[in-house]
Each structure stands twice: as C-alpha cells, then as structure tokens.
C-alpha cells in the first residue's frame, strides 16, 4: 500500500512539469522524458528503493545537509555515515563548530580522507556564525561565498535544504543523464555547458519537486546505473535508455581515458601518515618522530610543506610541527 501511495503521489506531482523545451544541441528535454514515461518511472523507482539516509530525513536541517554534502565528496556513503553522526553529535550547529579550533575539526575528521574539507567546513561554520547569525544562508550567492563551497555543494544545499529549483550535478547524476539521454557510457571529466542546460531543462516546474527528482536520479546512479557493472535489468528506464538501446557501446575515445590514481608510495599517502601522527598527538611533534612515520626525507619534507601550505599543520620553532590552532 505504501508503495502504491508513493507511485500515486509521484504521478500526481508530475502534472506541473515544465513543457517541452527545444534544445539546439539535440539534447532530449523534459518533454521527451515525459512522453515515454521515463520521469514517472524514475520517481516510482525512487519511492520504493530509496535508502534511508539521515541527511534525507525530514528532521535534517540545512547545517546537517551542508555537513553531509562536504563529507560525501569523493567518499562512499558507508564511510561517511559514522563520521557524519559523530560530527553532528559533537557540533550540532555551525556556531558550535565555530567555537572549536581547527585542530579539533581535523582530529574529529579522522581518517575520512581529503582532510582539507575539515578546515574548510570549520571556516564555513565561522563565516555562517559571524555573517549569517549562525544560520546556513539560503541563497546561491551567499552559499557560494562560504569557504569551501563550490557550485555543486551550493546547488545541493539550496535544493535539498531549502527546496529550491537548481540542477544538482554530481557524478551519479551526470552518468545517468549521459547514458539515458545521450547514449554515452559516461560523462566528460568536467561538467559541460550542454550538461548543465540538459539538467536544468529536466527540472520539474512544480515547486518543491525538483529536489525529489534530483535525488531520485542521484540514487539511480548510485545503486543501479553504476560506473562499473551497471545493473541494467534492474533499471526502471532500461527500455528507454539511449545507451542500452545502442548496445551499451564502450567509452568514447574523445572523452579521454580515466586512469585510477595509485596511492601506495604517493605524496598523498605520506601526507596521511604525517597527519595521523599530528592528529594522534596531544601537542607539538618533533621532526624526528615524523621521520619515523615516513623514512624518505625529501618526500617527507615536501609533504610537510604542503600540509603547512594547506593549513593542516603549523611549523613551530625547534623543528616541531602541530595541527593548526
């Protein structure tokens, strides 16, 4: 019964979707999607298969959504969940985080990866506290002015936290649209003007429905239309998918090949080792202790310098290092 009610709600809410928009580039538009039922099918699928994630719940406020969006950048949901819950338990509001030190933020971030996000989130919390009275702003311009908030994160927060009509183009959404609408196995390395125009043309005109559409396409890409081994038989729009109809052609050489980035022995691994020593210490760490964490002196010096440049560490007198104060 719940699934049937969700389907009925999805069908009813589609009545006010935008009309056909001509696209000189040849992209399919909302009129094409509605004509063959793809939009309805995706929303029905989402109503029955959406994961219960804390940042999607009705009680998740703008701050929680901002934290989740920053944590989810280049990080799997399974790793984000415990970090997200611990972070909000400690700092449930921007002002609570703003009162803490950058070192506290880095320590709490732990091994989630890409720790500059912790510094930027801390800086954003201070900006929200000092410039917006402790409330996450709801305008795109104000969101974009926050430290560490780019166009994707601003659109996601404006959409999911405030119900606004913005195209939310993450990796999953871009891959679904590339396959479904354009017949390409994947999207280009960076969003193009054509992609943005297509995504915007597909947004529902009904107030409040655009966020549901965006998260439904996002979920489809995360669970079914995955980068590797897509589960096409489980896709609600497989029969209308341009890529599937074309026989699932391989990568277009014009898009350029993506090569997986190694980790072992890289500066990134070195930085992680050194930062772990600083994070786990109760105060400044002598250079000799850092030397035990990474024996290659040149690489260690280069990585330490980059940690300092990124605001993740401070160089102190006597050859000591510490987390930022």
Regions found by a protein language model. Name each.
Residues 294-308:
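Short amphipathic alpha-helical interaction segments
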Residues 303-306, 320-324:
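Residues in the recognition helix of alpha-helical DNA-binding motifs
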Residues 308-319:
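A short, conserved structural fragment
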């Amino acid at each position: 019964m719940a699934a049937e009610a969700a389907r009925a709600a999805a069908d009813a809410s589609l009545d006010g979707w935008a009309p056909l928009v001509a696209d000189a580039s040849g992209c399919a538009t909302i009129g094409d999607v509605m004509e063959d039922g793809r939009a309805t099918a995706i929303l029905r699928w989402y109503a029955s298969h959406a994961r219960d994630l804390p940042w999607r719940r009705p009680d998740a406020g703008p701050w929680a959504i901002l934290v989740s969006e920053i944590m989810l950048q280049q990080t799997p949901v399974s790793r984000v969940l415990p970090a997200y819950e611990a972070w909000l338990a400690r700092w449930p509001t921007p002002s609570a985080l703003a009162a803490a030190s950058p070192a506290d933020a880095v320590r709490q971030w732990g091994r989630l990866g890409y720790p500059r996000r912790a510094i930027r989130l801390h800086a954003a919390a201070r900006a929200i506290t000092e410039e917006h009275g402790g409330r996450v702003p709801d305008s795109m311009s104000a969101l974009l002015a926050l430290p560490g908030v780019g166009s994707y994160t601003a659109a996601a927060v404006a959409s999911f936290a405030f119900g606004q009509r913005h195209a939310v183009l993450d990796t999953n959404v871009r891959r679904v649209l590339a396959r479904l609408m354009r017949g390409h196995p994947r999207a280009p390395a960076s969003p193009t003007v054509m992609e943005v125009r297509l995504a915007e043309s597909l947004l529902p005109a009904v107030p409040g429905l655009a966020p549901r559409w965006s998260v439904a396409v996002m979920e489809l890409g995360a669970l079914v239309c995955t980068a590797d081994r897509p589960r096409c038989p489980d896709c609600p729009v497989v029969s209308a998918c341009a890529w599937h109809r074309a026989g699932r052609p391989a990568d277009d050489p014009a898009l350029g090949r993506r090569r997986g980035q190694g980790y072992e022995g890289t500066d990134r691994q070195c930085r992680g080792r050194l930062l772990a020593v600083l994070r786990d210490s109760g105060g400044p760490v002598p250079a000799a202790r850092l030397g035990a964490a990474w024996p290659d002196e040149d690489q260690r010096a280069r990585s330490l310098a980059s940690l300092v440049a990124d605001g993740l560490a401070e160089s102190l007198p006597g050859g000591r290092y510490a987390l930022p104060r």
